[in-house]
A protein has these predicted regions:
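Long, well-ordered core segments of solenoidal/helical folds
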Residues: 182-191, 245-261, 296-319, 352-373, ...
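Pro/Thr/Ser/Gly-rich low-complexity, intrinsically disordered linker/stalk tracts
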Residues: 27-62
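Active-site lining segments of carbohydrate-active enzymes
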Residues: 211-214, 273-380, 390-394, 482-500
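Extracellular fibronectin type III
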Residues: 113-130
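Well-ordered alpha-helical scaffold segments within catalytic/enzyme domains
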Residues: 151-170, 224-240, 251-260, 273-293, ...
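Extended polysaccharide-engagement surfaces of secreted carbohydrate-active enzymes
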Residues: 381-546
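Recognizes extended acidic, P/S/T-rich segments that occur
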Residues: 68-101
Length: 546
């Protein structure tokens, strides 16, 4: 059959445009393999997940600005029976409702700035067991609906205030007296000044910068403690002089130069506290500020958070979600979350900060861990990083009604030090600083208490015993009061005589074998390491070591 030329130019143009559209819609998707420092494609094909819904993650193509994600029980993805999430902004997606238990297949495609889509990725199979913990991620609209319209929002909600104020008039009166005395001292002494000298650890040959690197962080933390204490005492008492003190301190902090000695890029250790601790004080004393004063605080906070947002540690969210193994970067996301919650509706980017932090928490936190509670960097860095995560878990629960303890890691978070650094142990297994004994961290009280309200209590009684034997310091101040006010009583300490004497932390490749967990002076302890993380970050020990 001989083809005849098209005589209608409009029809020819229409067919040409249709052909272009088909070709554009089917442009290939770059599905390169993940590099060693990337999170990659998860759940992997054939994986069995512990959380429902699972977090789908993938490699972001260079020109991608959004994604569509589909999952179905049928690998052919028929129209009926396939769920589609469109216009996903991160290279990860967690649904806002649990999936049906069973086998699912998932795939994604990318869209560029014009809205043109790639072909779909290959399908990956995932098993969602009926016993998986339920932890859906609320979408942006639901995030806003859950956060109180008023203040406070961080650690407390407006409806919590009558109960807390009643407590400090009764059994918690000594705690209020302690906080009030501290606030009085701060009012008498005046605000801690802005650090006058630049400090940084970036140039190891510059002794002058290194000299002030850590002291500047200490000075910043002190100034923030003063502001938080004044704001919290005002929140509890309503006494105007403490509110005026909080107002003075917050405006003082807002006047510090974000490009000066506390600049995030120059010294992230001094800059990090200023991403979230002024937000706490602002939230607790919100009603003492005029609109003009709020604007000044908002402008400074926006400048500081945006510098962190654009830094290599966050890389505008997408960068860190793709490459989440940076140690310092894992201390930033929850600080952005607190700022996002405190300044929701006040700073334009605040909803983005919060949404990023939630997607980070769901899809790739913790990164140096396994579901058994292990921590690749060792118990010293486990202690440091989990002391910060404990604050986020409280904020997530109060502001967003998200129970982060449902994550398997947190359900077993205290097992790692129990097995790697039992009482009287002369060292603490593997990882940075493991040559020395581990002091019991105060934050473990949060988990010992919170496990009673989340699940069956798990091993909390054994953690309480470990903390007692290791002489865990008592939590005082604001955190101690919040623990007692918002959490159940801690589990009674129980010696781990009935626990297995050994445990394998499979995800970090560590086996810790004992003859007894009760006293290292009577124990034969043999530990092995063959970690899939290698010697990255603070997990310095060589492979196949013991």
């Amino acid at each position: 059959m001989r083809l005849q030329p098209l005589r209608d130019p409009r029809l020819a143009l229409s067919l040409m445009l249709s052909l272009i559209a088909v070709v554009a819609a089917e442009r290939p998707l770059d599905e390169r393999a993940a590099r060693p420092d990337e999170w990659g494609y998860r759940p992997a094909d054939g994986a069995r997940v512990a959380l429902n819904p699972p977090s789908f993650t993938w490699i972001a193509p260079a020109d991608a600005v959004a994604y569509d994600v589909e999952w179905s029980a049928d690998p052919a993805f028929p129209a009926v029976g396939t769920t589609t999430a469109a216009s996903v902004v991160w290279p990860t997606y967690t649904h806002d409702a649990p999936l049906a238990a069973g086998t699912h297949h998932w795939r994604y495609r990318a869209r560029d700035a014009r809205g043109d889509a790639t072909a779909w990725s290959r399908a990956r199979r995932v098993e969602v067991p009926a016993a998986a913990a339920i932890l859906p991620l609320p979408g942006r609209a639901e995030q806003r609906a859950r956060v109180p319209a008023g203040h406070p929002r961080l650690f407390l909600r407006p409806e919590d205030l009558p109960r807390l104020r009643e407590l400090v008039r009764g059994p918690e009166a000594p705690a209020l007296a302690e906080l009030r005395a501290a606030a009085e001292r701060y009012l008498a002494a005046g605000p801690t000044p802005e650090p006058p000298h630049k400090g940084s650890a970036r140039d190891k040959t510059n002794a002058e910068l290194i000299k002030y690197w850590w002291p500047n962080r200490v000075q910043v933390e002190q100034a923030c403690t003063e502001a938080e204490t004044l704001a919290f005492v005002y929140l509890l008492t309503g006494e105007r002089r403490f509110g005026e003190g909080a107002r003075r301190w917050l405006l003082h902090l807002a006047a510090w130069d974000p490009q000066g000695t506390t600049n995030f890029t120059l010294n992230c250790e001094a800059g990090k506290p200023l991403l979230h601790r002024p937000a706490r004080a602002y939230d607790w004393a919100w009603d003492v500020f005029t609109a003009e004063e709020r604007g000044r605080i908002q402008a400074t906070m926006r400048t500081r958070v945006l510098e962190a947002w654009n830094s290599g540690e966050v890389a505008r969210g997408v960068g860190h979600l793709q490459r989440p193994y940076g140690s310092h970067a894992n201390r930033v996301w929850h600080k952005l979350a607190e700022a996002g919650i405190a300044f929701l509706d006040e700073i334009p980017e605040a909803p983005q900060w919060l949404d990023y932090a939630l997607n980070k928490f769901y899809s790739c936190y913790p990164v140096w861990s396994d579901d058994d509670g292990g921590w690749h960097e060792g118990v010293s860095y486990w202690s440091s990083y989990q002391s910060k995560a404990a604050g986020w878990l409280q904020v997530a629960q109060t502001a967003l009604r998200i129970d982060g303890l449902r994550k398997p890691f947190f359900a077993q978070v205290g097992d790692y030090p129990l097995y790697l650094a039992p009482p009287h142990s002369p060292n603490s297994g593997f990882g940075d600083l493991s040559f020395r004994p581990l002091d019991a961290p105060a934050f473990l009280e949060y988990h010992v208490r919170a496990r009673a309200a989340s699940g069956d209590g798990g091993n909390a009684a054994y953690w309480a015993w470990w903390a007692r034997e290791k002489r865990q310091p008592a939590n005082g101040g604001i955190i101690g009061l919040l623990y007692r006010a918002n959490l159940p009583a801690p589990a009674a300490p129980r010696p781990p005589a009935d626990l297995p004497a050994s445990k394998v932390f499979r995800g970090i490749g560590v086996a810790s074998l004992h003859t007894t967990l009760l006293d290292s002076r009577e124990d034969v302890h043999f530990a092995f390491k063959a970690s899939p993380f290698g010697s990255q970050s603070h997990g310095h020990n060589p492979q196949n070591s013991f």
